[in-house]
A protein has these predicted regions:
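Divalent metal-dependent hydrolysis catalytic cores, especially in the metallo-beta-lactamase
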Residues: 23-43, 100-102
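Ordered, amphipathic secondary-structure segments that act as subunit-interaction surfaces
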Residues: 87-88, 104-105
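Short beta-strand/loop segments at the ligand-binding rim of alpha/beta enzyme cores
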Residues: 2, 97-102
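Short, ordered loop/turn segments at secondary-structure junctions
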Residues: 39, 64, 106, 178
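Short, conserved beta-strand segments within well-ordered enzyme catalytic domains
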Residues: 35, 58-60
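Charged catalytic cores and adjacent phosphate/nucleic-acid-binding surfaces used
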Residues: 1-9, 13-15, 19-24, 45-47, ...
Length: 233
C-alpha cells in the first residue's frame, strides 16, 4: 500500500492544493492514501470526517508542527494542543495519544544558505558536517523516525537524512511535501499491510512495517535506501 506521508491542502496557508485536486492527482499517479500534514491547527475532526467520507481513498489527518527543533510531522493526535511548540512537550503529548512523530526535512537548507538557515544546525558549516555529527542532534532521540525522502529537498539533503536514519537504526519515511498537484507522490511510504483507518495507520508505523520509496511517478518504484534493492511490487 502506497501512502504519501506529507501533503498540504488549503488548510495550510502556504498551499494552493484543494482536497478535490489532491485526490484526483493521487489516484492518477497510483497512490492508495494521503496524509494531510497541515501547518497550524489542522482540520477540525468533524470537518475531516465529512471530507474523508466524500472520497474513495484513505485520507489521514496529521499535523506539521513548527517546534524549537524544526518541523515535526505528527500522526495519531487529534489536533493542535498547547505546548506542542516544544519538542519534549510534544513527545509527551504524542505518547499520551499513542501517536507517532517524524522529523520532517531535517537537513533542508543545510548546503545552500541563500534561502535561509537549517532549522537544526543554523550556524554549522553544512559542507563540513558529517552524518555522525548530525545524528547527535537531540531531536533524533525524541522522534520515532526521520523523513528521508522529501519532495522539497535536494538529493544531497535527503541523502544526509538517509545516512542519519541508517546510523540510528530507523526505517525512514517518504512524502512529497506537496503544496500543489506538482510532485504529489514523488516520495511515498510503502506499507506491508493494508491500512483502512487512522488507528491501523499508526499501528503499522509503530510496528515498523513500512519502507520509504521513490520512483512512483516514473513507473519504477524502488526503496529509498543507501543500498541497491529490487523494485517494490
Amino acid at each position: 500500500m502506497l501512502i504519501d506521508l506529507h501533503v498540504h491542502t488549503l488548510k495550510s496557508a502556504d498551499s494552493s492544493l484543494s482536497p478535490e485536486d489532491m485526490v484526483r492527482e493521487a489516484k492518477r499517479v497510483g497512490l492508495d492514501g494521503v496524509c494531510l500534514t497541515e501547518h497550524g491547527g489542522g482540520w477540525d475532526r468533524h470537518d475531516f470526517e465529512r471530507l474523508a467520507s466524500r472520497y474513495d481513498m484513505l485520507l489521514i489527518p496529521a499535523l506539521e508542527v513548527d517546534t524549537d527543533m524544526g518541523h515535526i510531522a505528527v500522526f495519531g493526535v487529534g489536533g493542535y494542543a498547547p505546548g506542542m511548540a516544544k519538542v519534549r512537550d510534544l513527545r509527551r503529548i504524542v505518547d499520551a495519544a499513542g501517536g507517532f512523530m517524524v522529523v520532517a526535512h531535517p537537513f533542508r537548507r543545510m548546503f545552500d544558505r541563500t534561502t535561509g538557515r537549517n532549522f537544526l544546525f543554523p550556524d554549522a558549516d553544512g559542507q563540513a558536517l558529517t552524518a555522525r555529527q548530525a545524528a547527535e542532534h537531540p531531536v533524533f532521540q525524541l522522534v520515532d523516525d526521520v523523513e528521508v525522502g522529501n519532495g522539497g529537498n535536494s538529493p544531497r539533503e535527503n541523502g544526509l537524512a538517509r545516512e542519519v536514519a541508517d546510523m540510528l537504526g530507523r526505517k525512514g519515511t517518504g512524502g512529497s511535501d506537496a503544496h500543489s498537484t506538482h510532485g504529489l507522490g514523488c516520495f511515498v511510504t510503502h506499507f506491508e499491510r493494508d491500512v483502512r483507518c487512522v488507528g491501523e495507520f499508526v499501528e503499522e508505523l509503530r510496528a515498523g512495517r513500512y519502507t520509504p520509496a521513490q520512483g512512483l511517478l516514473q513507473g519504477k518504484l524502488r526503496p529509498l535506501t543507501t543500498d541497491s534493492h529490487p523494485a517494490l511490487t
